[in-house]
């Protein structure tokens, strides 16, 4: 919903400011299709510095949604995304894009945003959902299994992060519950209630909630 010409001009000026290089330039934007639908994602390249000190990077700008965009979450917290990515980079060897800059104000582009380095790879699409079609749907069973195992491995690494400090307090859900699992479950139910507040129900999801509550693990 943002004007790409205006964004390019404003981001060009901002890059000069954050790099401290008056010759910093950025390329035209490439907008990924089929994924990243919760907010605007812009792919571009930037160059700054001179001669042997020249820096060239492939970058991604992630913009918070505007007030005119259809909300996907009750509250869109861009800062939490940045904090999570930085924690994962610091505490694991998971390949996560390095966040270079964060702009919390709306003075530059009209919405908060951050800029990170690109990580090369293939992203399963949201449109259509990858379970209905696309490169992952068409992949061989062996390739699908490999992606599944890699995803489970990444999730396992994330759960091995034991560090508890004021830097991780933002990860706690504010829902009631004696354990992290109970609070997570309560948070998901709250999100579901927000999604269906217009009157559209999802019986399968509600049945799943009921099943989980009646089969709750003794250790959670």
Question: Language-model segments: which ranges?
Answer:
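Juxta-kinase regulatory segment immediately upstream of eukaryotic protein kinase catalytic domains
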Residues: 1-27
């Amino acid at each position: 919903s943002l004007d790409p010409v205006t964004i390019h001009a404003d981001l060009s000026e901002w890059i000069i400011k954050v790099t401290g290089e008056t010759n910093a330039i950025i390329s035209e934007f490439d907008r990924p299709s089929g994924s990243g639908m919760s907010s605007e994602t812009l792919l571009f390249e930037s160059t700054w510095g001179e001669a042997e000190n020249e820096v060239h990077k492939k970058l991604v700008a992630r913009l918070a949604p505007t007030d005119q965009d259809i909300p996907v979450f009750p509250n869109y917290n861009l800062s939490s995304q940045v904090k999570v990515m930085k924690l994962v980079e610091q505490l694991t060897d998971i390949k996560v894009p390095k966040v270079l800059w964060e702009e919390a104000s709306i003075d530059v582009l009209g919405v908060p945003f951050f800029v990170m380095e690109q990580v090369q790879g293939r992203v399963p699409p949201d449109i259509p959902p990858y379970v209905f079609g696309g490169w992952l749907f068409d992949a061989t069973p062996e390739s699908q299994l490999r992606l599944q195992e890699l995803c489970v491995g990444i999730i396992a690494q994330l759960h091995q992060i034991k560090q508890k400090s004021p830097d991780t307090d933002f990860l706690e859900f504010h829902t009631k519950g004696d354990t992290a699992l109970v609070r997570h479950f309560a948070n998901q139910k709250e999100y579901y209630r927000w999604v269906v507040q217009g009157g559209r129900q999802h019986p399968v999801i509600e049945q799943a909630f009921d099943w989980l509550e009646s089969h709750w693990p003794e250790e959670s």
